[in-house]
């Protein structure tokens, strides 16, 4: 007998939710991911057969604004993402546990899910004074990041701090803060810049990987094309005034 896949569909079955409710969720996910309606069957199949991803979320040099944005997602709701669509095993902001028990759990998950988990990172990486300007669990953030990145299947850089260095990297940059990709290499990296990013973009990126097991198509800067491919300016109803050179004085 085949092992049962811990997919989104099996989760719906365990909670005795109808097939109709499952299909509604798949339709919503298709729209959120910016996919055409013709991709619905692909999304449904992925939701039936793909195992829910394990996510480890690290916090570096940041203000937690990206997490504040993430927990305000409404399409889908953050509670649905965390409880139903992914397995968030570590986040020192959202986790119920703290201190040594949480850090021990992180080590356990990294060992059990080696090569299979998604590493979400929020915040830049300070390098001066051996990284002492940001420590978590008695270790520098750089140490924690490098170790966690080794076993990650993919890395998501949430926010401008993780993507580019952020405010901390502004001149004169006293802590020598850099982006995550300046420290980590050799892994698929998805940049989700913004201060903070749009919450639905944050959930959409992790859900794309959850459904298809691969990172979405990226632009030249490493950002997901479905979310960063067009400028709001291009579809603004005031664009005609801009093109005509009509400005308020």
List the model feature ranges, each with a label.
Residues 202, 207-249:
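A conserved mid-domain beta-alpha-beta active-site/ligand-binding segment of alpha/beta enzyme cores
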Residues 47, 52-54, 61, 65, ...:
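Metallocofactor- and cofactor-centric catalytic cores in central/energy metabolism, strongly enriched
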Residues 56, 156-159, 190-192:
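Hydrophobic/aromatic beta-strand patches that form the interior of the parallel beta-sheet core
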Residues 1-17:
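N-terminal secretory signal peptides
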Residues 139-152:
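Catalytic-core regions built around general acid/base machinery
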Residues 71-88:
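Short catalytic helix/loop segments, enriched in acidic residues and glycine
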Residues 165-186, 190-194:
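Class I SAM-dependent methyltransferase SAM-binding "motif I" and its flanking Rossmann-like core
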Residues 21-43:
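N-terminal export signals
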């Amino acid at each position: 007998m085949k092992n049962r896949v811990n997919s989104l569909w099996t989760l719906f079955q365990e909670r005795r939710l109808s097939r109709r409710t499952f299909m509604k969720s798949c339709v919503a996910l298709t729209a959120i991911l910016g996919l055409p309606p013709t991709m619905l069957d692909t999304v449904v199949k992925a939701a039936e057969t793909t195992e829910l991803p394990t996510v480890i979320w690290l916090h570096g040099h940041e203000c937690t604004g990206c997490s504040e944005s993430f927990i305000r997602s409404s399409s889908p709701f953050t509670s649905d993402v965390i409880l139903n669509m992914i397995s968030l095993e570590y986040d020192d902001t959202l986790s119920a546990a703290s201190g040594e028990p949480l850090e021990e759990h992180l080590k356990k998950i990294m060992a059990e899910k080696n090569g299979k988990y998604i590493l979400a990172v929020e915040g830049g990486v300070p390098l001066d004074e051996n990284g002492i300007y940001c420590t978590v669990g008695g270790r520098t953030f750089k140490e924690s990041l490098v170790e966690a990145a080794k076993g990650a299947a993919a890395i998501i850089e949430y926010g401008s701090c993780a993507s580019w260095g952020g405010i901390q990297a502004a001149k004169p940059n006293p802590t020598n803060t850099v982006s995550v990709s300046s420290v980590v290499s050799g892994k698929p990296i998805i940049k989700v810049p913004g201060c903070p990013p749009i919450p639905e973009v944050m959930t959409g990126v992790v859900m794309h990987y959850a459904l298809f097991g691969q990172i979405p198509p990226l632009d030249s800067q490493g950002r997901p094309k479905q979310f960063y491919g067009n400028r709001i300016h291009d579809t603004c109803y005031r664009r005609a005034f801009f093109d005509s050179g009509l400005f308020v004085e």
